[in-house]
Swiss-Prot record:
Organism: Salmonella arizonae (strain ATCC BAA-731 / CDC346-86 / RSK2980)
Membrane topology note: Peripheral membrane protein
Record: residues binding Mn(2+) 1: D8, H10, D41, H197
Name this polypeptide is given: UDP-2,3-diacylglucosamine hydrolase
Keyword list, A-Z: Cell inner membrane, Cell membrane, Hydrolase, Lipid A biosynthesis, Lipid biosynthesis, Lipid metabolism, Manganese, Membrane, Metal-binding
Length: 240
């Protein structure tokens, strides 16, 4: 009896080892789970469900196979794949969740999210996020031809990489006060998120009690997952 969480795989054809590792994960570890939650940035980029990238179809088939085996899969959008829509969700069998969700996991209330909304010290990113999450902006973008969307996405990624190279590590991490505020708003003692690529279990205080923030790692040379059972919450790194 276990529920699994992963995030920040950043799947792309240029990283076949990570793709292969994810396929093995779906076929082995995930098959034993009660449910799988993907907390954003499953893909390196997403320019629309109509993108004919063969990798997208391959991943949809693999996730659907997991779901058809009896393991439900849930998805929270990340900052790289926030345009994943109902079509891909239907093809993959995933259930799309809001950006914040509280789960009852074996009697333990747990708040889950991608994590980028916690990085409130990065004012530039938060301003950009507000723009691209505007429904009108998204609708307009999705009406553009695919080749134009690809160019825009490539420019945005290049700009983001350049901007991040000049930012301090602290600015790109979560804001401690924002974390506590979110946990107290939802009245939880556990928070699981990704985004920062800094896997760790942090102890803090929220709601006047001990609390825990569990941060998933990105998939690079190894995979990262959080395994929640009735008795424990584990952050686990594993070879790909």
């Amino acid at each position: 009896m276990a529920t699994l969480f992963i995030a920040d795989l950043h799947l792309q054809t240029e990283e076949p080892a990570i793709v292969a590792g994810f396929l093995r994960f779906l076929a082995v570890e995930a098959r034993q789970a009660d449910a799988l939650y993907i907390l954003g940035d499953l893909f390196e980029a997403w320019i629309g469900d109509d993108d004919p990238n063969p990798l997208h179809r391959e991943m949809a088939v693999a996730i659907k196979s997991l779901v058809d085996s009896g393991v439900p899969c849930f998805f929270i959008h990340g900052n790289r794949d926030f345009l994943i829509g109902k079509r891909f969700a239907r093809e993959s069998g995933m259930t799309l969740l809001p950006q914040e969700k509280v789960l009852d996991l074996y009697g333990r209330n747990v708040l889950i999210m991608h994590g980028d909304t916690l990085c409130t010290d990065d004012a530039g990113y938060q301003a950009f996020r507000a723009k691209v999450h505007n429904p009108w902006v998204q609708r307009l973008f999705l009406t553009l031809p695919l080749f134009i969307r690809r160019r825009i996405a490539a420019r945005l990624r290049a700009g983001s990489k350049a901007a991040n190279s000049s930012k301090s590590l602290d600015i790109m991490d979560v804001n401690a006060q924002t974390v506590v505020a979110e946990m107290e708003k939802h009245r939880v003692q556990w928070l699981i998120h990704g985004h920062t690529h800094r896997p760790a279990v942090h102890e803090l205080s929220a709601n006047g009690q001990p609390a825990f923030r569990v941060v998933l790692g990105a998939w690079h040379h190894e995979g990262s997952m959080v395994k929640v059972t009735p008795d424990n919450v584990e952050l686990i790194a594993f070879p790909l």
